[in-house]
Amino acid sequence: MKFAVIQFPGSNCDLDMLHAIRDSLGEEAEYIWHAETSLAGFDAVLLPGGFSYGDYLRTGAIAKFSSIMPEVLRFAEMGKPVLGVCNGFQILTEIGLLPGALIRNNNLHFICKTVPLRVANASTMFTELYEEGEIIQVPVAHGEGNYYCDDETLLKLKENNQIVFTYDSVNPNGSRADIAGIVNERGNVLGMMPHPERAVEEIIGGTDGLRLFESVVKAWKEEQVNA
């Protein structure tokens, strides 16, 4: 399986993502610069964390207009896996692949620590190797990770089982309904604020994030067999 790691000016978690895929997962991964216009030959797209375009205007607002984004939209429309982590999640809301928005943390401070997450939906292509309700430990590192949506959107997310991860015990940023990660209605686009790529090795704190990437590979292999 081959992953595309999209790089924007200001991305700073792209190396972590590449390392997680190549060295921990054992799959292929390549950087794709934001000015490129093709994702031919790739099976999954990863939008890493960081501060794309310096977070000017607002997080993800300028990245929305990058040359690669129409291809990311087309990729998602084809049903292929798209994962946005932290700034990547913010970008996914800006381009309309996911509902809602990410706003300033309610304490107005940058948060960097490992937090407990509850797996709220273990039936997606990103979570099938987790148990429903399982508590995992994954790092967060953000200043604008407070997920917000209106009441109608929140009701729809709940009814469609689109809430994939929630903060357990303590909500670090004020997100509505403790939301840490959501998928689109089709289930092939996941946005999350915590960093699974930073939880793939025991030596640096645990491997709870690795199963997310392993789930994607498993789903992809099953699709190839059934194609």
UniProtKB/Swiss-Prot annotation:
Please give the superkingdom of this protein's source.
Answer: Bacteria
Q: Which residues form the active site?
A: C86 (nucleophile), H195, E197
Q: List the catalytic activities from the record.
A: N(2)-formyl-N(1)-(5-phospho-beta-D-ribosyl)glycinamide + L-glutamine + ATP + H2O = 2-formamido-N(1)-(5-O-phospho-beta-D-ribosyl)acetamidine + L-glutamate + ADP + phosphate + H(+); L-glutamine + H2O = L-glutamate + NH4(+)
Query: What keywords sit in the KW lines?
Result: ATP-binding, Cytoplasm, Glutamine amidotransferase, Hydrolase, Ligase, Nucleotide-binding, Purine biosynthesis
Q: Which PROSITE patterns does the protein's record reference? A: GATASE_TYPE_1
Question: What task does this protein carry out?
Answer: Part of the phosphoribosylformylglycinamidine synthase complex involved in the purines biosynthetic pathway. Catalyzes the ATP-dependent conversion of formylglycinamide ribonucleotide (FGAR) and glutamine to yield formylglycinamidine ribonucleotide (FGAM) and glutamate. The FGAM synthase complex is composed of three subunits. PurQ produces an ammonia molecule by converting glutamine to glutamate. PurL transfers the ammonia molecule to FGAR to form FGAM in an ATP-dependent manner.
Descriptive protein name: Phosphoribosylformylglycinamidine synthase subunit PurQ
